């Protein structure tokens, strides 16, 4: 452990990390010891939350990770106008010190330099100017990699050590993170949903899947009178109406000899993979609605079936709607009181059943 200088009014000693190539320094010895644990390949701290198999080298890392599971954010900043919340008193104190208070300055210990900084990161970046050397240098023999970021050094050193497979009994070490993920997919599936028995390779994917069981699925019924099918998305409902009820399969395959046609453009893109096996399946990007303009914390309104499919129904006037759709127009008859209450379903049902030729004849008459 090496003392690198004095700072601040109290002249606190700065302790530098003794690891080769690392120039991190701290005020307290406990924080330095915690930092040095990050240089070791051992990760003794394991998350005890169910379906989470993450391990950590430092105690504070696992404490922070567990609090993310529990979503503990109960400590609010007392400063007026500040809405920040924190899960630990230490985080709140650091926020008040650097954001709203007067932090103890870190003075540059190089003779003749009077610069001072509020954060150690800024001081480390400043020290590289005096020495004309990068803060982080790879200590592996034969490697001349340099950088001004300690985080980049840690990521670079993992390339030398490799990424070890976390499965029990597997000694595979991959040179890159991407290669490790490709290797992990070869292992048999071990995680399984207790509700539907669906297998997963990642704990994060299993947690996201479990959230779908808790949510109430969206039920969009088909508006055709003699169809009782329901769908969970507007896209599936639109595809159903275009293909089965309206027979609007306008997207044809451009390959010669192929007579396939589709109701949706996305279905055609998936079909094109059949003609070109080497072509990877496209990740389709669906344009979201105007929810981003509603601001944070607001929910987007559930899309109304009649609004999304109105342009489809206008193509065929003989499309019979369910009586549920006409009831939405009952407000038109509430402006004045009638002696005999009219039924909106009876008065409006003829609009959707009138043939096009008859409508033109009545208009000309």
Curated annotation (Swiss-Prot):
Determine the domain of life of the protein's source: Eukaryota
What are the entry keywords? Metal-binding, Repeat, RNA-binding, Zinc, Zinc-finger
Q: Does the keyword Acyltransferase apply?
A: no
Pfam families attached to this UniProt entry: TFIIIA_zf-C2H2, zf-C2H2
Question: What GO molecular function terms would the record report?
Answer: RNA binding; zinc ion binding
GO CC terms? nucleus
First and last residues of each zinc finger (C2H2-type): 15-39, 45-69, 75-100, 106-130, 136-160, 163-187, 191-213, 220-245, 251-275
Biological function: p43 is a 5S RNA binding protein which is a major constituent of oocytes and comprises part of a 42S ribonucleoprotein storage particle.
Q: Summarize subunit and interaction data from the UniProt record for this chain.
A: The 42S RNP particle comprises four subunits each of which contains one molecule of 5S RNA, three molecules of tRNA, two molecules of p50 (EF1-alpha) and one molecule of the 5S RNA binding protein 43.
The protein, known as: P43 5S RNA-binding protein
Per the UniProt entry, what species is this protein from, by scientific name? Xenopus laevis
């Amino acid at each position: 452990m090496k003392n690198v200088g004095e700072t601040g009014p109290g002249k606190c000693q700065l302790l530098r990390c003794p690891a080769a190539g690392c120039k991190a320094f701290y005020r307290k010895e406990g924080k330095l010891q915690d930092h040095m644990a990050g240089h070791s390949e051992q990760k003794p701290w394991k998350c005890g939350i169910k379906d989470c198999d993450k391990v950590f080298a430092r105690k504070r890392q696992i404490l922070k990770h567990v609090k993310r599971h529990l979503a503990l954010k109960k400590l609010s900043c007392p400063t007026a106008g500040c809405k920040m919340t924190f899960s630990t008193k230490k985080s709140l104190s650091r926020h008040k010190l650097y954001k709203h208070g007067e932090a103890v300055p870190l003075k540059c210990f190089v003779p003749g330099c009077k610069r001072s900084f509020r954060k150690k990161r800024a001081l480390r970046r400043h020290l590289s100017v005096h020495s004309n050397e990068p803060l982080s240098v790879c200590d592996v023999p034969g490697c001349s990699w340099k950088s001004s970021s300690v985080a980049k050094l840690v990521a670079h050193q993992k390339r030398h050590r490799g990424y070890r497979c976390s499965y029990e009994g597997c000694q595979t070490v991959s040179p890159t993170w991407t290669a490790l993920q490709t290797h992990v997919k070869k292992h048999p599936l071990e995680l399984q949903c207790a509700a539907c028995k669906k297998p997963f390779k990642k704990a994060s994917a299993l947690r996201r899947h479990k959230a779908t069981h808790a949510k109430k699925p969206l039920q969009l019924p088909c508006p055709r009178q003699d169809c009782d099918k329901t769908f969970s998305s507007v896209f599936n409902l639109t595809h159903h109406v275009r293909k089965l009820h309206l027979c609007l399969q306008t997207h044809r395959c451009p390959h010669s000899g192929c007579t396939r046609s589709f109701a949706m453009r996305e279905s055609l893109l998936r079909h094109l993979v059949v003609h070109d096996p080497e072509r990877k399946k496209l990740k389709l990007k669906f344009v979201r609605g105007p929810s981003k303009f509603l601001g944070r914390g607001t929910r987007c309104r559930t899309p109304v079936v009649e609004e999304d499919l109105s342009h489809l129904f206008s193509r065929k006037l003989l499309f019979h709607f369910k009586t549920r759709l006409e009831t939405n127009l009952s407000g038109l008859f509430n402006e004045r009181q009638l002696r005999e209450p009219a039924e909106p379903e009876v008065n409006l049902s003829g609009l959707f059943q009138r043939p096009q030729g008859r409508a033109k004849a009545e208009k000309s008459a």
